[in-house]
Amino acid sequence: LRCFHRLRPCWTGFLSILFGVFIFSYVAVRLMSILFRRAGFFTILFIWTATTILSAAEKATVNLTVHDSLTSPNQPATIKATLTQKGSRAETGIGGEPIELLVAGQVAATAMTGGDGRALLSYTSKAKAMIPFTVRAGAASNVQVAEAGANLAVWERRSPMMAVEMAALMEDAEGRRPMPDAAAELGKLTQFYYNVLYVVTHDKAAGTNDQVNAQARQWLKDQKFPVGHIIVLSSGPEAWGTKLDELHAAGWKTLKIGVGRTKAFAEAFLQRRLDAVMVPEPAKGEAPRKAKVAKEWKDVRKKM
């Protein structure tokens, strides 16, 4: 019994130490649990915030585009501008936004975009000219977007016209290098006589029709080709023939000759008893029977 009483203080101390270790372990585990929970919360919060920011940035991708227009003196031209918003899945029009048309730096017309994002702006020129113009979002617009530009061709309907397939101007569609002498020879044809239409086949990978129009315009400018009216068409074999009929029906009946590279382009003219020149010389058997063939652009004028 005396031994027990002697050991009691030691036993009590041991239990106190054991209890302290237990309490410390419990507190440490609870503390770590809280820290991990908070870390997880902040991680989730960070991911959600980043996703929201990226989503907002994506929603803010807005484009304003426009393409060339064609009219005659004292006749109103309808210029179509399109305001779109590109999301992760689709591109949609933005309606209810004011759009301004600028000619020579001055606001010439205003219009609101419809539900499809299109705004129709009217402009009338009194004289024959090739008029560069710009469209932009109006001062009261809720969006911030870069300006877009194109050309308005104002031509007399009695003036001779020619159509040129863009592919006939390039050595290689991939490299985008111009055919030798093409710019100089086309410049001679258009300086005093022809008004020129450039016909471009729409490549969906290159963007919308308006974007392809802008790319073609910039390439022609960079390569010093004469300014003309640009038409963007689908790659279907009947696309140019249908457009040719539309132009004739609209009064542009002086369009009687085309210079192109593809068989489909040449046939569209020949089927309507019009003239077609193919350049460069196609492979044997590829040229339609009545098509004229030029080996290079220096020979084109001789065939017209």
Predicted regions and their residues:
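Bacterial N-terminal signal peptides
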Residues: 42-51
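Alpha-helical substrate-recognition element adjacent to the catalytic core
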Residues: 62-63, 86, 114-119, 146-241
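Bacterial Sec-dependent signal peptides at the C-terminal "C-region" and cleavage site
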Residues: 50-58
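Hydrophobic alpha-helical signal peptides and transmembrane signal-/tail-anchor segments
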Residues: 13-28
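Bacterial N-terminal signal peptides that target proteins for export
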Residues: 7, 11, 31-42
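Beta-strand-enriched, solvent-exposed domains that form extended recognition/catalytic surfaces
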Residues: 57-157
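C-terminal cap/substrate-recognition subdomain and adjoining C-terminal extension
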Residues: 212-304
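Short hydrophobic targeting helices and cationic amphipathic motifs
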Residues: 4-6, 15
